[in-house]
């Protein structure tokens, strides 16, 4: 089980300095009911202050019990439409590796990962006169990773060497999505390329039977839409992600599976599957959901969602069939004040392989608490009381 999983898996980068004040608590848990697989969990506090110290300085923090990710942003530093951010992240258990092949979780070949890094981020707004922003994003940095055995790691299994990884990423992002649990409105189309360099590559495993590659290229396209009819309580979401890689290895290949929506910058969910069950070189991932109200005030909602992916497996992780599909319902309840929200969910993986047969079940829990919304409600109530 990993606390701070969401922070260790991917930096929570945005296409621009976040202009809104935010104070959120996010919790998520996903548990397989079919065999024993990796348990996925995140628990973190998200804070964003767009006006720290001076009007052009912003602070973003995501803090978990044993991991943190942050950025100090400087709006309009290089030009009226170019922002600069300095990112830092680090802590424990954010880079754990889980070996899953043919639907079986190999604990003896899995291990814990820890580390930290820094980055320099540039965000340039290309179309300042338009309502929906188009941003060019350029990022670069370094990350140090260390690995340790769990109490289940095989004594004969040699861990990867501790190493420094540098990276450079460039992308174009049209629109964007708030760092919230299922936001009502969101529109994003983005394309990305990232190159990674390991300063110390090498072999590991049983008698050096696997290797960490010195360089890896990752590229992907994302298109997503969230739209809610607030007068009826209905909502529709859709997302398409297509990605590929060159010279990827176990430690940086594309991983698909699980249902936690905030467990990665670009989550590749598959209901009913283990977290990161599928290892792929290339993939196309589709997801969609429809939300219907169960009460007149729309506080109770039923969400029906599904996800499907076509994958080109990482060598050594092949399995029958290239399509993977999962689906399931969620039951959502929002407090009368709209300060907190809890979601219970169930997922069934149609093509998840368990004991030689297809089909797997999972359950999950999601929770969000919005401190900023509570603050605004208290201030509004205080003003109303004083006016009376």
Describe the residue ranges of each PLM region.
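Bacterial N-terminal signal peptides
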Residues: 1-10
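Outer-membrane beta-barrel initiation region
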Residues: 13-97, 166-184, 280, 294-298, ...
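Transmembrane beta-strand segments of outer-membrane beta-barrel domains in Gram-negative
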Residues: 21-25, 32, 36, 86-237, ...
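Residue-level signature of outer-membrane beta-barrel architecture
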Residues: 47-49, 72-76, 120-126, 172-176, ...
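Extracytoplasmic gating/loop element in the C-terminal half of outer-membrane beta-barrel translocons
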Residues: 232-314
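Short glycine-rich, acidic/polar surface loops and turns
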Residues: 287-289, 317, 326-333
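Conserved active-site loop/cleft motifs that coordinate metal ions or position small ligands
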Residues: 301-305, 340-348
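Outer-membrane beta-barrel "beta-signal"
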Residues: 331-335, 340-342, 357-388
């Amino acid at each position: 089980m990993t606390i701070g999983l969401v922070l260790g898996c991917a930096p929570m980068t945005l296409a621009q300095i976040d202009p809104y004040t935010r104070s959120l608590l996010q919790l998520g848990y996903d548990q397989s009911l079919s065999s024993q697989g990796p348990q996925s969990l995140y628990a973190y506090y998200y804070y964003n202050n767009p006006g720290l110290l001076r009007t052009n300085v912003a602070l973003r923090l995501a803090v978990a019990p044993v991991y943190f990710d942050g950025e100090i942003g400087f709006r309009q530093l290089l030009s009226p439409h170019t922002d600069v951010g300095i990112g830092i992240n680090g802590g424990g258990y954010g880079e754990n590796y889980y070996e899953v092949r043919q639907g079986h979780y190999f604990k003896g070949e899995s291990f814990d990962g820890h580390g930290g890094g820094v980055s320099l981020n540039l965000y340039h707004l290309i179309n300042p006169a338009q309502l929906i922003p188009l941003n060019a994003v350029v990022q670069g940095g370094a990350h140090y990773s260390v690995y340790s055995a769990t109490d289940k790691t095989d004594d004969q299994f040699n861990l990867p060497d501790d190493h420094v990884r540098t990276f450079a990423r460039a992308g174009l992002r049209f629109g964007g999505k708030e760092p919230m649990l299922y936001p009502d409105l969101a529109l994003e189309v983005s394309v990305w390329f990232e190159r990674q360099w390991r300063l110390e590559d090498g072999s590991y495993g049983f008698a050096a039977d696997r290797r960490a590659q010195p360089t890896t290229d990752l590229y992907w396209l994302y298109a997503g839409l969230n739209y809610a009819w607030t007068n009826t309580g209905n909502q529709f979401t859709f997302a398409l992600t297509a990605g590929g890689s060159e010279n990827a290895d176990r430690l940086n290949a594309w991983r698909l599976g699980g249902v936690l929506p905030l467990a990665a910058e670009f989550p590749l969910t598959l209901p009913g599957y283990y977290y990161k069950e599928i290892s792929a070189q290339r993939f196309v991932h589709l997801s969609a959901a429809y939300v219907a109200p169960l009460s007149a005030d729309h506080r109770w909602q039923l969400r029906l969602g599904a996800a499907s992916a076509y994958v080109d497996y990482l060598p050594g992780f092949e399995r029958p069939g290239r399509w993977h599909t999962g689906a399931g319902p969620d039951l959502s309840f929002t407090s009368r004040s709209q300060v907190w929200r809890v979601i219970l969910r169930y997922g069934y993986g149609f093509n998840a392989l368990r004991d030689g047969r297809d089909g797997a079940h999972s359950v999950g829990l999601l929770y969000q608490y919005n401190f900023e919304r509570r603050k605004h409600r208290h201030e509004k109530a205080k003003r109303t009381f004083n006016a009376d």
